[in-house]
Amino acid sequence: MELILKYFPNLSEQQKTQFAALYDLYTDWNSKINVISRKDITNLYEHHVLHSLGIAKVINFTPDTQIMDLGTGGGFPGIPLAILFPEVQFHLVDSIGKKVKVATEIANAIGLKNVTFRHCRAEEEKRKFDFVVSRAVMPLGDLIKIIRKNIRQEQHNALPNGLICLKGGELEQETMPVKHKTMLYDLKNEFTEDFFKTKKVVYVTISGL
């Protein structure tokens, strides 16, 4: 929890309470339904919560922004972002029902009011959003093909509507074929921990489609 306050020192008391509750909740649920590697649960705040919040270092979402978290798994990056942006609406989608159950139960336990959930495949979600966020669920080109239909045209954020992904490693081969405007942000410039040395936020403009 101290790690979150290190980089986000201006949290409200409610946000602090919500972030602090995540460790016990994920530890408990993860013992029943595996949504995080059992070996990695002790790194929850660094590898999962703070990593999710890396998106907030790229864009400060305006109130009433509508965001879909595609392939949310146990709720990443959607739940940490929903805590940080209480006036933004998040819709968390995953094709695995038991993972959606965990994310739903955790969101309810901490009193998140700005999240909804759906158990479905990405292709089945037809609604429009300002942004789609995701954490390394599939190659970038494949992801763009699936979510193009979900990006609305109306703009009200500093960045045009589009896709924001958390990815790691060498991404040149993955981003080179992408025809949309793509920007890479190195999280090592925001977070000093070794885990973030190869981690990036990938932003793809997909507005107006």
UniProtKB/Swiss-Prot annotation:
<dbReference type="GO" id="GO:0005829">
    <property type="term" value="C:cytosol"/>
</dbReference>
<feature type="binding site">
    <location>
        <begin position="122"/>
        <end position="123"/>
    </location>
    <ligand>
        <name>S-adenosyl-L-methionine</name>
    </ligand>
</feature>
<dbReference type="InterPro" id="IPR029063">
    <property type="entry name" value="SAM-dependent_MTases_sf"/>
</dbReference>
<dbReference type="GO" id="GO:0070043">
    <property type="term" value="F:rRNA (guanine-N7-)-methyltransferase activity"/>
</dbReference>
<feature type="binding site">
    <location>
        <position position="71"/>
    </location>
    <ligand>
        <name>S-adenosyl-L-methionine</name>
    </ligand>
</feature>
<comment type="similarity">
    <text>Belongs to the methyltransferase superfamily. RNA methyltransferase RsmG family.</text>
</comment>
<comment type="function">
    <text>Specifically methylates the N7 position of a guanine in 16S rRNA.</text>
</comment>
<feature type="binding site">
    <location>
        <position position="135"/>
    </location>
    <ligand>
        <name>S-adenosyl-L-methionine</name>
    </ligand>
</feature>
<keyword id="KW-0963">Cytoplasm</keyword>
<keyword id="KW-0489">Methyltransferase</keyword>
<dbReference type="Pfam" id="PF02527">
    <property type="entry name" value="GidB"/>
</dbReference>
<feature type="binding site">
    <location>
        <position position="76"/>
    </location>
    <ligand>
        <name>S-adenosyl-L-methionine</name>
    </ligand>
</feature>
<protein>
    <recommendedName>
        <fullName>Ribosomal RNA small subunit methyltransferase G</fullName>
        <ecNumber>2.1.1.-</ecNumber>
    </recommendedName>
</protein>
<dbReference type="InterPro" id="IPR003682">
    <property type="entry name" value="rRNA_ssu_MeTfrase_G"/>
</dbReference>
<keyword id="KW-0808">Transferase</keyword>
<keyword id="KW-0698">rRNA processing</keyword>
<keyword id="KW-0949">S-adenosyl-L-methionine</keyword>
